[in-house]
């Protein structure tokens, strides 16, 4: 039992990751239901029964949840959570021997937790139920055919915490691209992830600590920040510093 939170800004592959996480659960041995907005495009997951609400028919997300609970599901999932009342009821279900998986728009794993606290989830309840908060971003990969080597300037080395001897060259996008990447200088995308979980984090969630303290607690539990994961891809030539700056200046959705 417990609560799993998935988050990202818009257009960061969140729907795909949500499907993967839910599909990885042992749904053949458990009954899962999803709470879905009837106005949204259907996106069904095998062996997960959708229960839909429709504001045009005066049914609310909580109405759909109550209907779903009549089936005594072991798991409940919902995407792009925005309804405060539904959020509270879902966390209560996570506290009552059910696995709850939700997704919402947030810039990182800690912001997702603070958003739940901010909409009125009792801190001790959230701390008791939180299994983990997983955040992701999608970054474009440099085209392997036309990417260029360059000597990073001192300010970039300082940002990467490297010396010139440790990092004599980096990769960047080719100026004109090539036929392989259709002139874009990038080819394909990859995801970077950040997982906030652990006893230290839950201890400070219960205290409703500020985001900086929560991030420090999560780091002690082993969380590697998204930016750190992104810089790892810069160092190994998978992507460029310019791409990381583009990704991390994008605003999170609300």
Regions from the PLM with identified roles:
Residues 1-254:
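Short, flexible helix-loop junctions that flank or precede catalytic/ligand sites
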